[in-house]
Amino acid sequence: GWTPSSDIVNALEPVAPPTQKGIFAFGNSGSSVSMSNLMNSSGVIASDVTGVGSARSSLGATSYGGDKAIFAFGSTGSYTSISNLVSNSGVVASDTSGVGTVRVSSPATTFGTSGQAIFAYGYASSPTNISNKVSGAGVVANDSTGVGTARYDPAAASYGVGLGIFGFGNASGSGTAITNLVSSSGVISADVAGVGTGREAPAATSYGGDKAIFAYGTTPGVGTQSMSNKVSNTGVVASDTSGVGTVRYLLAAAGYGGDKGAFAYGRDGGPRYSIKNLISNTGVVASNTTGVGTARSNLAAAGYSISA
């Protein structure tokens, strides 16, 4: 029978293979560090790899180019916009001079089908909503005018086909649950009313091939959290799912095995952790797995490699 043209377009739209491995890097173990920890396609995190690039914390990371990753922004003791590219074999490159407003707590997600990505939000001299796109070759662009509520310490992940979402964060001193969707051309939408408990410094990753999940974080005046919120393949955020694992914030998350994810590291007030919680391809958060690598917080993570 006849196939509608929209279905033809959808069927022919190139879809990048999902990443199989992840990398957790940089952070704060009491002071800023630059080591990295690679995660294999089974979700096993390896021991520390000696750091390359300026030690820093409160940075962001995302995949780019289909099978590589980039870490950018953060604090070396002062705010910076330097970036470090990661090859498809997980090798971290030396610093690339910064582009865009220096800031901290600015997460990132992929968008489109050409390996692009976008960093957004964060804290400069105050909460901000500026964004910086990343080309499929890993080149960071200048600032784009902000959209949505200025805030820092949200989290971000990809969902659907070529789409992304920023959610939660600290706006004006309080935790929020608002989200902002990212189109396949990298356009950030206006605020979407929050669903779930408002909080800052959660982490997020994709799972199930086309969905995402936010988990953990802290709510000012309430305390550290472990609940999660799933995101459908149309970008709809679900209400809270009861928490699993140790409550913590300032952790990181990355996908592995093509359709699963892992949340790892973080802190709860004083203690810093290296524990890990795996996410199944149906979005179920597993109980704690004993940590590997230096316990730390304020790190970032991203997927890389399309080879298992």
Residue ranges and their predicted role:
Residues 1-308:
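Polar, enzyme-active/binding microenvironments
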